[in-house]
Amino acid sequence: MTMITDSLAVVLQRRDWENPGVTQLNRLAAHPPFASWRNSEEARTDRPSQQLRSLNGEWRFAWFPAPEAVPESWLECDLPDADTVVVPSNWQMHGYDAPIYTNVTYPITVNPPFVPAENPTGCYSLTFNIDESWLQEGQTRIIFDGVNSAFHLWCNGRWVGYGQDSRLPSEFDLSAFLRAGENRLAVMVLRWSDGSYLEDQDMWRMSGIFRDVSLLHKPTTQISDFQVTTRFNDDFSRAVLEAEVQMYGELRDELRVTVSLWQGETQVASGTAPFGGEIIDERGGYADRVTLRLNVENPELWSAEIPNLYRAVVELHTADGTLIEAEACDVGFREVRIENGLLLLNGKPLLIRGVNRHEHHPLHGQVMDEQTMVQDILLMKQNNFNAVRCSHYPNHPLWYTLCDRYGLYVVDEANIETHGMVPMNRLTDDPRWLPAMSERVTRMVQRDRNHPSVIIWSLGNESGHGANHDALYRWIKSVDPSRPVQYEGGGADTTATDIICPMYARVDEDQPFPAVPKWSIKKWLSLPGEMRPLILCEYAHAMGNSLGGFAKYWQAFRQYPRLQGGFVWDWVDQSLIKYDENGNPWSAYGGDFGDTPNDRQFCMNGLVFADRTPHPALTEAKHQQQFFQFRLSGRTIEVTSEYLFRHSDNEFLHWMVALDGKPLASGEVPLDVGPQGKQLIELPELPQPESAGQLWLTVRVVQPNATAWSEAGHISAWQQWRLAENLSVTLPSASHAIPQLTTSGTDFCIELGNKRWQFNRQSGFLSQMWIGDEKQLLTPLRDQFTRAPLDNDIGVSEATRIDPNAWVERWKAAGHYQAEAALLQCTADTLADAVLITTAHAWQHQGKTLFISRKTYRIDGHGEMVINVDVAVASDTPHPARVGLTCQLAQVAERVNWLGLGPQENYPDRLTAACFDRWDLPLSDMYTPYVFPSENGLRCGTRELNYGPHQWRGDFQFNISRYSQQQLMETSHRHLLHAEEGTWLNIDGFHMGIGGDDSWSPSVSAEFQLSAGHYHYQLVWCQK
């Protein structure tokens, strides 16, 4: 044990937090989570241990701008102005200091290992009583599961130790410091340390004791470590559970270890042995270790599909059977290996349906509770995710237990990122930083290696490629050859990774960056000598309204076996709740706390909002990742299961044929399909309607019974096909009414019954409509070529740093947002049964014509206005965001009804999950509340839209809400939006894709750009 004087002054003088060679003082060795049961039955059933006591709750807290400002007296007693805070928590969430959101740029001046003199410091203290029996025998430990960034610990005024690495436990022996009666802990937490240079992850930078604190009482002679490994014969019919157990304390001949394996109430296998390890070298073996091997016949294998778990109980006892203590863990029998270029689980090639997940809570910052963790897992499973990458640090220890039990594959990632360094490997190639990096990797492995859900180790994130990575890769491969190692830094295919694991590589497009090119994922597989599997560690940047082009990745994954999936970036928006002057909550992002530097809304890349409400893009991910694929041939549906281990036992296929959303026939068939098997389902003779309309066949896989992660009736997969329709002609009914045209000085007016239309002859726009005496428009019907920019449109552009290649900057520079209409033509003609208005406009900016729009409006005796639009696009202007029409309707109706793709928001490059049907939703549901406002709520493939008294027909896309595109563009946060008068309607003949391969370069695929020189579309607008 390191002995240091107890005084605060001496500790401050040492400045351990600015010494990369000091990562801890007196911290105990890493190990799996312990509970030290004194009853083996309690260990088997995972009951709360009487030897494990939580110290979570109210602590006293005082904040100082620097450690030097902390008074020495604090070591002995609480300060008079100390506050009360809850542990675990981030102190920034309690009003102390400010959270900082930055992606790449370090929040402190880069001068490793030194940190600013102004180093916010939190002083925590807790007074508690100890069980007196704990003082008489054994060892009492204190466990801090997570403290950011570094801390010194005192107990009863005496210095205990020091720890850093905010994402792994720091555990200390308190036995020599405790006394009968009251005891006082004092924890001095520093916001910045040399460890901060290894923690430059894309997240909020927060501080404090943010994970659990607990006391653990172990016997003097104790289990100090244990590791379980499963091994198999070739066909997995026989397995061996290998348990290596290590003890600490007095090594006595009478000591024995028993390892028993349980499946529920049934003991499957058991073995007992004394200590004395196998021969290691010419000097012998470890005297304090023993390895037991238990044979298991026909083990029930673990996978994310069927997470079968056993329970291993490790007992330390004397020869006569007296139990000293027991530890235990869940065991999953599974094997991970790479063979012939494929990542295999239990001999089957995995397809990773993965997502990156930060530990984030909108109210509690980086504090995770069990309810939130379970909620995340349930949502992931319900949306067909089978894997999660712990980006970019080891998670709360409970997370892995939950992933074991519910079934998720885990990439466990070391808490190492040096993204802001120049070059990025400045520290990771420096031997002075090897000890710090080594502790972050080795301690992660030692804590988490017993979890079956952990199938891959990761050396960290975005830290370049250095010699330290190579050393740590070799260490992991030596101590745990049962798992592959991945690491993206240095080009994603270095010698420090078993898996090609690029981030944001495109499907077909190379990105030839200097030194570290990103090849297309298809090309990467074919590079000379390359035989590793490729799994994207990050792809499909889900920032705001995004995930366009997601289907293209999944087409490639299913086409090329060695393309084994990837991890979407990312799971949850990292917005934080703030409150306005009236106490109303709102969602904040970078810069909203006065934090500098900051990267604005780049912290919000989630498939779900911070409160776990899904983004529309989540449905697209669910559909593309679904485990059942379908093919229609005639009346036969071929259902293919992509499950590797699971036989369908809780699924029905529900099918329905509908004409324009009206059901004509339906049925239900139980699915009986084995792993990777097929089932043919013959449908009855399908109806052939005589009336016009779109005929669609929809199939849905429904789970009738609830599961551990879904409710009864859960829909896990679906598909639609448009069927051939009989030709039919609907003749228009005769009308004896003829609309009347009148001309005034400024307007053409058309009247039919109680309806009137007014076209302004000077502007050439439809300026007003009346039904009776009620005006229908608040603004004229005008062309629209722009959208409130998406995050993907903005890219890396900021007010002080413009990226001219970003879509929004191209549109601004070309004048798309400032274009004004010059009238070229506005005429009116009376036909035999209708009135025809003809207009033409040149949309210009600074004398340059960008678009020419020609329209005809034909108003007939039925009151229907047929609008034909022809748009010519200048050859030298950027591709427009949309080609459509917009106006502000006077009505605010409660609901919107449409026949088209839905129900969720969808865009041309993100619509495979949408279904054609007749949908009816509240107006409020047509708006997607992205925290950073942007274009939203589009519905594609629309044939009919009904809102208030109005109906539109044609083949178009639309969005409808209380917010104009201008307000969306000019507003920084959703809570600042105000409902405008009436309702804004945008009807597009054509709309550009949204992109999403990444959010910092123009990522809309060419096929979804509006690159043509001419566009034509037609609408029918009438009143019901």
From Swiss-Prot:
Keywords: Glycosidase, Hydrolase, Magnesium, Metal-binding, Sodium. Its cofactor is Mg(2+); Na(+). Binds 2 magnesium ions per monomer. Binds 1 sodium ion per monomer. Substrate binds at residues 103, 202, 462, 538-541, 605, 1000. It catalyses: Hydrolysis of terminal non-reducing beta-D-galactose residues in beta-D-galactosides. The keyword Magnesium applies. Mg(2+) 2 binds at residue 598. Its EC number is 3.2.1.23. Homotetramer. This is Beta-galactosidase.
